[in-house]
Amino acid sequence: MKTIQIAIDGPASSGKSTVAKIIAKDFGFTYLDTGAMYRAVTYMALKNQLGVEEVEALLALLDQHPISFGRSETGDQLVFVGDVDITHPIRENEVTNHVSAIAAIPQVREKLVSLQQEIAQQGGIVMDGRDIGTVVLPQAELKIFLVASVDERAERRYKENIAKGIETDLETLKKEIAARDYKDSHRETSPLKQAEDAVYLDTTGLNIQEVVEKIKAEAEKRM
């Protein structure tokens, strides 16, 4: 069985990270959460009170505090900037609401995309994000474009937040997700869009295992 590159793209809370982690584990591939990388930069920007126009200062911060990943004892992914564990802080609402603006900065994307491509060269990788199939891994053997209704995605994010103890209002989440969809698909640099050769998969009404099985079946055809 050959190792392949799997690119999973889609809007906020479409289930990308959840299914990507399971697929990577099942195939013994590396999982790279690119969204966590943009969240890490956003977290640093907020922590240092940097605006989106302060690009040089942001890039300098990235050099001083490189983003890296680790594993907890239970096998969960940990995210670090420098040697500081920021796994939980990057999921806070404040970071979520600012990440689209930071991710739209061309120089930040360029730096992170280059890092993502470097990691992917090892082969046997599952990567999820907004522009994996179109920009980061245009040569990936399998590209998936995951979508779901705004209502369903808000419901999922709501349950995740409650489980993490993050105070959340469902109606506010719906508005935030719709606004983020617009920002992500209308930005100038690497907008969210389906790659021409991507498999379109609407996950509305499907459970996680059903989505995983559909993607694994597509992957196995290419191995």
Swiss-Prot record:
Reaction catalysed by this enzyme: CMP + ATP = CDP + ADP; dCMP + ATP = dCDP + ADP
Q: Which residues of the sequence carry a binding annotation for ATP?
A: G10, P11, A12, S13, S14, G15, K16, S17, T18
Q: What is a single cellular component term in the Gene Ontology annotation?
A: cytosol
GO biological process entries: nucleobase-containing small molecule interconversion; pyrimidine nucleotide metabolic process
Give, as one word, the top-level EC class.
transferase
Q: Where in the cell is it found?
A: Cytoplasm
Q: Name one GO molecular function term.
A: ATP binding
Kindly state which keywords UniProt assigns to this record, in alphabetical order: ATP-binding, Cytoplasm, Kinase, Nucleotide-binding, Transferase
What positions belong to coiled-coil segments? none
Would you say which domain of life the source belongs to? Bacteria
Gene3D superfamilies per the UniProt record, alphabetical = P-loop containing nucleotide triphosphate hydrolases (3.40.50.300)
Quote the EC number: 2.7.4.25
* Family the UniProt entry places it in: Belongs to the cytidylate kinase family. Type 1 subfamily.
Xref: PANTHER family = CYTIDYLATE KINASE (PTHR21299:SF2), CYTIDYLATE KINASE/PANTOATE-BETA-ALANINE LIGASE (PTHR21299)
Q: What is this protein called?
A: Cytidylate kinase
Which species is listed as the source?
Answer: Streptococcus pneumoniae (strain 70585)
Q: What's the gene?
A: cmk
